[in-house]
Each structure stands twice: as C-alpha cells, then as structure tokens.
C-alpha cells in the first residue's frame, strides 16, 4: 500500500497555488490547465492540479522506493533556500544557485569538479597541514565557489533518476539535458510555462514563496515515505531515524543484510549441532 502525503484543495488555495501570471504573459500550451481570468490574472484549475500532483507524487514514490536518486532544481531567489532545505531533509540532492551547462550530459567533467571540491575540504580541515594562512584562504575561496555550484550534488555518486523542478522557464537547460538522457522530469508549471519535455506536470504558482514551499515540502514528504517503506520492508525499524540520506539508507540495508546472513549461519550451525547430538544419542541406543 502506498502512503502518499495527504493534501486538500484548501491547502492549495491557502498556499496561493491557483494564482498564475498576467493573462498577457501566458503560454497557450497551458490552456488545458487554466480555469479562467480574474483581474487580468490567469487562475489555475486546481481540480487538474489535484489529479496531476497525485500522479507526480506516485511516480516519485515508486522511483525512490527502487532506491533512485532525486535532484531538486530551483535557482530563482525565492526558491533557492527552500529547495536546499527540503532536499537535505529527505536525503536527496539539489542545485539552487546556477545550473552549469553539462551538469547531466557531461557528468564525467562535473565529477572531476566534485573530486576537486572534496580535496579542498580535506586540505582545509587537516589540522596538520603545512600551508600558510594565505594559501589556506585561497583554498577556502576556491572551495566556497565550487560549493555554491555543486555542493548540493557532491555526494550524489552518479546521475539522478528523476528531477524535481521549480520554474521550467528558468531551468530549461537542465530539462533539455534530462530529456536527452531519458531522466523523468517532475515540475511545477505556471501559466507562462512550456509543458513540453515535462513527464509529470503539476500546474501551479511557481513564484510565490508559500506555493513553492508547499510543493517542495510535499515532494520531500513523499520521498521520506518511500524511504521509510523501503527500510520497513527490509525489516528495519525506522523509529528514531533522523538521517535519511542515500548513504545512511545503504548503510542500514547493508547492516541488516549482514545480520540476516549471520542469523542464517548461526541457525545452520545450530541445526548441524542438533543433528550431531541426535545421531550420537541414536548410536548409543543401538549399541545397547
């Protein structure tokens, strides 16, 4: 049974999800998702949003349940902090400063930059280093620059299995790269957005902080539910677990597999000992 986070039409309204852009700024491709116009502002049909949001969350749940990685993308000012906070909360990855061309399609080069970032971190953290204060300041400057660009993906370990995007117009390069690599894209689409290339569209306000916060939180909650379900299915008690990062999840699953293997080996040894004792007892009875 899939336990997706619950939400109501009231939640959408209170978050301002239904407010689009000025009617003059619309993208005609969004017509199927628009309810009408009020005070020259397009109003999004929330009945469509409810259905499509549930579809998107279910798809996301299934991807994460299979231990897929999700990349949150939102580099506009009002989305940046929320994107980072919610991605970290559910143990996933994010880009919230600037999308560098080739982040997906040229992953090998990005991996080298990630390696360089980790090297700078080790140099700075090493208390026994022999570098001068000036050299350390230079390292920190380079580290900070890399961290702003790729800090949110430095532990991703490979291409993501899905993208969650706020503002498809601003993040169109990321979407094109994902499309090229057949990585599914889940995105909030405002009335000025182009739905082309979006596998799971969610019609909604992608500008207001409350709306962005609502979408990011419910996506994060869905990912957490999928992770908990996966761990519970493997017999792991999820009560008290606060770190749901992919690394921690893999550690828990490996430890659980070792425990099962040890228990199985111990059970086999016990059975062998019991059989040995039975044979000895049986043999002594036959002799008498």
From Swiss-Prot:
Q: Which InterPro entries match?
A: Ribosomal_uS2 (IPR001865), Ribosomal_uS2_bac/mit/plastid (IPR005706), Ribosomal_uS2_CS (IPR018130), Ribosomal_uS2_flav_dom_sf (IPR023591)
**Region: Disordered, residue numbers:** 255-288
Q: Tell me one GO biological process term.
A: translation
Similarity remark: Belongs to the universal ribosomal protein uS2 family.
Q: Which HAMAP family match?
A: Ribosomal_uS2_B
Specify the species. Answer: Ehrlichia chaffeensis (strain ATCC CRL-10679 / Arkansas)
Name of the featured protein: Small ribosomal subunit protein uS2
Which CDD domains does the record match to this protein? RPS2 (cd01425)
At the top level, the lineage of the source is: Bacteria
Q: Which PROSITE patterns does its entry note?
A: RIBOSOMAL_S2_1, RIBOSOMAL_S2_2
PANTHER family, alphabetically? Answer: 30S RIBOSOMAL PROTEIN S2 PROKARYOTIC AND ORGANELLAR, SMALL RIBOSOMAL SUBUNIT PROTEIN US2M
- Tell me which Gene3D superfamilies the record gives: Glucose-6-phosphate isomerase like protein, domain 1, Helix hairpin bin
> Which UniProt keywords are present, listed alphabetically?
Ribonucleoprotein, Ribosomal protein
Q: Give me the Gene Ontology terms describing cellular component.
A: cytosolic small ribosomal subunit
Q: One GO MF term, please?
A: structural constituent of ribosome
């Amino acid at each position: 049974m899939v336990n997706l986070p619950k939400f109501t039409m009231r939640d959408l309204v209170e978050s301002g999800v239904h407010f689009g852009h000025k009617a003059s700024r619309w993208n005609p491709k969004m017509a199927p998702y628009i309810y009408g116009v009020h005070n020259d502002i397009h109003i999004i049909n929330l009945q469509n949003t409810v259905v499509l949001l549930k579809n998107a969350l279910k798809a996301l749940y299934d991807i994460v349940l299979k231990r897929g990685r999700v990349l949150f993308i939102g580099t506009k000012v009002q989305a940046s902090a929320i994107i980072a906070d919610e991605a970290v909360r559910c143990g996933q990855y994010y880009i919230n400063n600037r999308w560098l061309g080739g982040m997906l399609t040229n992953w090998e080069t990005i991996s080298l930059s990630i390696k360089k970032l980790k090297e700078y971190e080790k140099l700075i953290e090493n208390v026994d280093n022999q570098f001068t204060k000036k050299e350390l300041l230079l390292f920190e400057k380079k580290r900070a620059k890399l961290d702003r660009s790729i800090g949110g993906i430095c532990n991703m370990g490979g291409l993501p299995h899905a993208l969650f995007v706020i503002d498809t117009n601003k993040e169109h390069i990321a979407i094109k790269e994902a499309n090229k690599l057949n990585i599914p894209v889940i995105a909030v689409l405002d009335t000025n957005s182009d739905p082309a290339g979006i596998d799971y569209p969610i019609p909604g306000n992608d500008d207001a902080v409350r709306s962005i916060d609502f979408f990011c939180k419910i996506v994060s909650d869905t990912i957490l539910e999928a992770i908990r379900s996966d761990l519970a299915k493997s017999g792991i008690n999820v009560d008290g677990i606060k770190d749901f990062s992919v690394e921690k999840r893999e550690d828990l699953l490996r430890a659980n597999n070792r425990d099962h293997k040890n228990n199985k080996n111990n059970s086999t040894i016990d059975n062998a000992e019991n059989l040995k004792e039975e044979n000895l007892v049986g043999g002594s009875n036959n002799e008498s």
